[in-house]
């Protein structure tokens, strides 16, 4: 890593040693499948950087992923194919029609059995009724509802086939979407957005709808993005969290409910400084989760259904640690997903043996929040306001829920490819 930098002036740290480890000289060794970041601290210049490491295994081209739109799902397989199912009233399934699909169906994005196809999908995102796909050549493709320009083609015409988004002058490495806005993260750490912008969620100091990609202001070192309802939260390479757009439920963690047209940094629990050492962020409808490097999850924003997992239903304007039903902070968390008005976290096996003196949580999937149809896998329809275990550890690699709150459905997938 960073061959042009004096190695003696750098410190390296893997944010998930279950996927990759890093030696003092920067040598990376794969230890499992998945993606993580190597944190690099340059002592000479007192600055941080993070390098993404993705271990796909012998057969995989990319990391599998599931995302949910309004009554539909999009699945990215490890072989680079994109499959969709569910509601298709606007062509969001990318099937050249508007016919609903009752089971997963392969799109035309990539066919792993066609030896002539070399460019495959590496990321997917879903808005309310539109789908965004990132291909391995760094291009972005969209389909579905386009009433606010969220397809990025300069029009408001809906599409039933994937179309290429033009106007992003850098290679894209990740995409995100929610409701009527789309985002692209580039390899240089810049963020571009297009679509609905009434609350300033494009971060360009404007509230005007953008029908083609516009560059977000104030941020230039972003490594991960996650879009909520009319806002987006972003992870900086230095481990801090930025957000922009709609904040009327305090989901930015700024101890206020002001909307912002330019990105703002999340505060710490006490509100006295900036929240630091974060390795992943996830935006729900109007709440945000942030996972720290030491495996603790922070939640902030709307909490009417208990989705913050803090033991009550009061909204929080500063980030607060998530707890279990005994009131203990849940530790050793390896992944978090904020979905609609609920939250899902994955706890990895602890190196500490449980005993009468130690109540370290066992590995598995823990949930909290809105559960009117049992979408939290609890075998009942009772809302939760603390994290409760619902699934034994099976190395879950992706988790998602549809965006329709009244009839929400959730899905998880493990490293064996089972959904």
Q: What is each of the regions a protein language model found here?
A:
Residues 67, 75, 125, 133, ...:
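Conserved beta-strand position repeated across blades of beta-propeller domains
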Residues 112-119, 175, 271-276, 327-331, ...:
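Short glycine-/Asp-/Thr-/Trp-enriched loop segments that recur within the blades
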Residues 64, 71, 80, 128-129, ...:
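Short coil/turn segments that connect the beta-strands within blades of beta-propeller domains
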Residues 1-60:
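Extracytoplasmic soluble-region selector
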Residues 76, 83-103, 143-161, 192-212, ...:
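Short glycine/serine- and acidic-residue-enriched loop/turn motifs that recur at repeat junctions
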Residues 56-89, 98, 365-367, 396, ...:
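An edge-strand/N-cap motif at the start of beta-rich repeat modules
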């Amino acid at each position: 890593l960073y061959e042009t930098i004096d190695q003696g002036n750098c410190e390296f740290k893997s944010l998930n040693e279950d996927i990759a480890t890093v030696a003092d000289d920067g040598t990376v060794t794969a230890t499992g499948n998945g993606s993580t970041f190597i944190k690099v601290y340059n002592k000479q210049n007192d600055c941080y950087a993070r390098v993404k490491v993705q271990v796909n295994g012998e057969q995989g081209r990319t990391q599998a992923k599931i995302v949910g739109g309004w009554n539909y799902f999009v699945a990215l397989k490890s072989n680079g194919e994109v499959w969709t199912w569910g509601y298709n009233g606007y062509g969001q399934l990318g099937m050249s029609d508007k016919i609903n699909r009752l089971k997963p169906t392969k799109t035309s994005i990539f066919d792993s059995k066609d030896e002539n196809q070399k460019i495959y999908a590496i990321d997917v995102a879903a808005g309310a009724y539109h789908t965004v796909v990132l291909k391995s050549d760094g291009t972005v493709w969209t389909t579905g509802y386009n009433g606010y320009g969220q397809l990025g083609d300069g029009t408001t015409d809906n599409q039933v086939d994937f179309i290429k988004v033009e106007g992003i002058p850098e290679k894209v490495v990740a995409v995100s979407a929610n409701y009527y806005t789309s985002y692209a993260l580039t390899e240089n750490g810049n963020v571009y957005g297009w679509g609905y912008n009434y609350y300033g969620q494009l971060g360009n100091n404007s509230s005007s709808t953008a029908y083609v990609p516009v560059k977000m202001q104030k941020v230039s070192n972003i490594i991960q993005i996650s879009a909520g309802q009319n806002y987006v939260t972003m992870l900086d390479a230095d481990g801090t969290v930025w957000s922009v757009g709609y904040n009327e439920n305090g989901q930015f963690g700024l101890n206020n409910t002001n909307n912002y047209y330019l990105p703002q940094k999340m505060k710490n629990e006490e509100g006295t400084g900036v929240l630091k050492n974060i390795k992943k962020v996830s935006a729900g409808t109007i709440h945000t989760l942030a996972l720290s490097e030491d495996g603790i999850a922070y939640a902030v924003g709307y909490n009417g259904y208990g989705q913050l997992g803090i033991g009550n239903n009061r909204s929080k304007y500063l980030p607060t640690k998530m707890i279990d039903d005994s009131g203990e902070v849940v530790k050793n968390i390896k992944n978090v997903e904020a979905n609609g008005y609920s939250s899902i976290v994955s706890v990895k096996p602890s190196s500490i043996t449980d005993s009468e003196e130690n109540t370290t949580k066992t590995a598995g999937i823990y949930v909290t929040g809105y559960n009117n149809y049992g979408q939290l896998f609890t075998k009942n329809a009772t809302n939760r306001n603390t994290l409760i275990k619902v699934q034994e550890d099976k190395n879950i690699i992706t988790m998602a829920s549809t965006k329709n709150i009244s009839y929400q459905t959730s899905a998880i997938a493990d490293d064996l490819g089972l959904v």
